[in-house]
């Protein structure tokens, strides 16, 4: 892990995915497992404090940027006097709230959309998809991946085109659901062929899109396979 002291109130660090795994964490822990994500963050803060004497004395502002090789994190102490004078319990609660919001984002700068911070937008977006699916009968496909490894396997070994549809990846009860909305100009034969190839990596979904919109969490959207390939290496190469 590389740590850079920006000024008295800000530090910046870069940690590779290999370093993350060497510390006993999986890279997906950072955005699918809140408890493990918090453990990882606090272990980093202890190391930063030891190397840079950067003591947490109030609310922190955190920015995360995901790259191909690892993650860059910028941590700043609040300069707001009102926040700095906050009671300890309230201060800790405020920090926990910020950290939880951070950990619920799906690499916000890479996806250009925060799942946590745009809950209303997400519901509107999902509603639009539902309406479209009702009006384009047969153009919606939903399948289920058993686990994240199956998602990664599909992303790295599928050669299906991605120009003729919009897609969403949901997570529900540690299972992953993949919804695909095909464009109007895509023929039924093409859709059926796509679905047949998809079933080599998945199984038919037992959940409707309406159910997923209400109870599941959207963790990726817009060319899901490309995002998965960017963040995760092929499991067969490990």
From Swiss-Prot:
The lineage of its organism: Bacteria, Bacillati, Bacillota, Bacilli, Bacillales. This is Adapter protein MecA. Pfam families: MecA (PF05389). PANTHER family: ADAPTER PROTEIN MECA, ADAPTER PROTEIN MECA 1. Homodimer. Residues 108-133 are annotated as: Disordered. Gene3D superfamilies: 3.30.70.1950. Enables the recognition and targeting of unfolded and aggregated proteins to the ClpC protease or to other proteins involved in proteolysis. Belongs to the MecA family.
């Amino acid at each position: 892990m590389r740590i850079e002291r920006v000024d008295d109130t800000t530090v910046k660090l870069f940690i590779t995915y290999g370093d993350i795994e060497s510390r006993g964490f999986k890279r997906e822990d950072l955005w699918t497992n809140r408890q493990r994500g918090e453990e990882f963050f606090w272990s980093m803060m202890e190391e930063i404090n030891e190397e840079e004497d950067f003591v947490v004395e109030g609310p922190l502002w955190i920015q995360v940027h995901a790259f191909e090789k690892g993650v860059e994190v910028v941590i700043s102490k609040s300069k707001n006097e009102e926040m700095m004078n906050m009671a300890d319990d309230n201060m800790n609660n405020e920090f926990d709230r910020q950290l939880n919001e951070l950990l619920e984002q799906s690499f916000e700068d890479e996806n250009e959309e925060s799942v946590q911070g745009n809950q209303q937008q997400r519901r509107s977006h999902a509603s639009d998809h539902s309406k479209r699916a009702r009006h384009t009968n047969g153009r919606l496909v939903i399948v289920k991946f058993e686990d994240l490894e199956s998602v990664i396997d599909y992303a790295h070994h599928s050669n299906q085109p991605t120009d003729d549809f919009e897609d969403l990846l949901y997570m529900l009860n540690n299972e992953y659901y993949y919804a695909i909305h095909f464009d109007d100009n895509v023929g039924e034969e093409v859709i059926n062929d796509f679905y047949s190839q998809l079933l080599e990596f998945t199984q038919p979904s037992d959940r409707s899109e309406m159910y997923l919109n209400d109870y599941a969490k959207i963790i990726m959207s817009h060319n899901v396979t490309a995002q998965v390939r960017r963040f995760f290496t092929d499991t067969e190469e490990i």
